[in-house]
């Protein structure tokens, strides 16, 4: 995980985690460039994405831990907004397990937490033959 920060002196802080096959740069182009200088933006590139493309992605928990450790090192444990899309939403969900981090608002976009879907498993097994 590599972190990009924008507007480090702003008092309002937001963490925006990109979806799979995107990057921090994608979030910046679509969102943060329209916010001006009033929000301190933390934009992580998850492993195997963007600036961290050479790193191996292992799990959402490991990415969340790396983001957590970075935020704590920067003394930023309270954020006004946490946003995660797709894979980024799963990582954000893992971040909520850290009791020393707090968010005023969290927003999950296109995140599925459903595991072992019986119909999907049946269909995948059927198509495999």
Question: Where do the protein language model's features map onto the residues?
Answer:
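A short loop-to-beta-strand scaffold at the N-terminal edge of the catalytic core in hydrolase folds
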Residues: 1-6
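Conserved catalytic-core motifs of eukaryotic protein kinase domains, centered on the activation segment
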Residues: 27-28, 52-56, 117-120
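Active-site signature of alpha/beta-hydrolase-fold catalytic machinery across serine-
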Residues: 29, 94-98
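A generic structural motif
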Residues: 36-41, 77, 102-103
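Active-site loop/oxyanion-hole signature of alpha/beta-hydrolase fold enzymes
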Residues: 42-80
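Gly/Ala-rich beta-loop-alpha elbow adjacent to hydrolase catalytic centers
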Residues: 83-92
